[in-house]
Amino acid sequence: MADPQVAALGVVFTVLLVFAIAVLLALRVRRVRPPGPQPFDTEPANRPLAAVVVNPTKFVDLEPVRATITSVCTALGWAEPLWLETTEADPGTGQSTAALQAGVDVVLACGGDGTVRTVAQVLAGTGVALGLLPAGTGNLLARNLDMHLNDIEGATRIALTGDERAVDVGRILIDDDPEERVFLVMAGMGFDAAIMANAPEALKARVGALAYVIAALRALKGQQTRVRLEMDGAAAQHRRIRTIVVGNCGRLQGGLVLMPGAELDDGLLDVVAIAPKGIMGWLAVTGRVLTRRRKGHHRVEHWQAKLVTITADSPQPAQLDGDPIGDARVMEFRADRGALVVRVAAPVTPARAFDTGGDA
């Protein structure tokens, strides 16, 4: 074979060899290449799911709220949340039960204290976490957990990614009603309940927290009532009171602390009885609340117990977590320690303090 032909065959063979090697390398690279990110909707079963139990009466326009919550869920890799609106006939019990049956990872209560309490009653003891999206006037549990108010986006992020904290639940039987109810912050009878009853939703919608001030002025002229107080099986005590409150935590609106020793997770209920006389008496009591002094005034008494029974001489206005529930004469309380799991903001560590959460 002539040299030019040999040379040509050599060139062809070399080209074919190089081509074959290139193909093999390409196939190898293709085999070991890691898979790229997959769209979330390819494996929906693997994405965590939240349910939102929302009180629509707390919003003028609900659609932006829903859009914000959904946007946060999808941005954090969660499935689109279940959206369950409360009604006048069902303020959250059926909706929360449906959420549990759907196997959700967390239930977000979006509304006022009544919505939060109703959802908590269903979740207590289940281990399923409660997320708080404060949208009421009081927002008492959120205040006692140091949550930011009026921030649906931030609250949603905490509800989905925050730490879990087991808190106590107060349980209560009222008069002859066999159904046990729950409260998360405070419950009681007398002056405080009269304030809640005289601050209707329409007034709160117009003037906000000022509605409670107006209602308090209306209730100042009420009379004292006699109550029998029993705690943890000890001998009964009798008092004349204007109001008696049993608390799971102690902070009210405006930073006021009615029960400085109350803790959400100590397994104890705090009891405070207030019996001022006249305007000067109310001023003295108010001073004790403002200065957070637990002792030293004979018109303000504090106790702690796991079991508390209050029996009034006559039916008195009563309230649960700031919601009026009509009149009651006998209220039996017990502390259910650590019964409810709540999502709270993670504590700020030095590392987190420098983390802005985004690009510079």
Predicted regions and their residues:
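Short glycine/serine/threonine-rich phosphate/pyrophosphate-binding segments
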Residues: 92, 114-119, 140, 167
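Gly/Ser/Thr-rich active-site loops/lids in small-molecule metabolic enzymes
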Residues: 203-211, 254, 260-281
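ATP/nucleoside-binding phosphotransfer catalytic cores, i.e., glycine-rich phosphate-binding loops
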Residues: 2-27, 231-238, 263, 273-360
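Short acidic/glycine-rich loop or secondary-structure boundary segments that cap or lie
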Residues: 192-195, 237-239, 252-255, 279-282
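ATP/NTP phosphate-donor binding region
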Residues: 1-107, 349, 359-360
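Catalytic core of DAGKc-family lipid kinases
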Residues: 75, 86, 124-129, 133-242
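Glycine-rich phosphate/pyrophosphate-binding beta-alpha loops
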Residues: 188, 192, 245-258, 324
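N-terminal glycine-rich "phosphate-gripper" loop used for MgATP/nucleotide binding
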Residues: 109-113
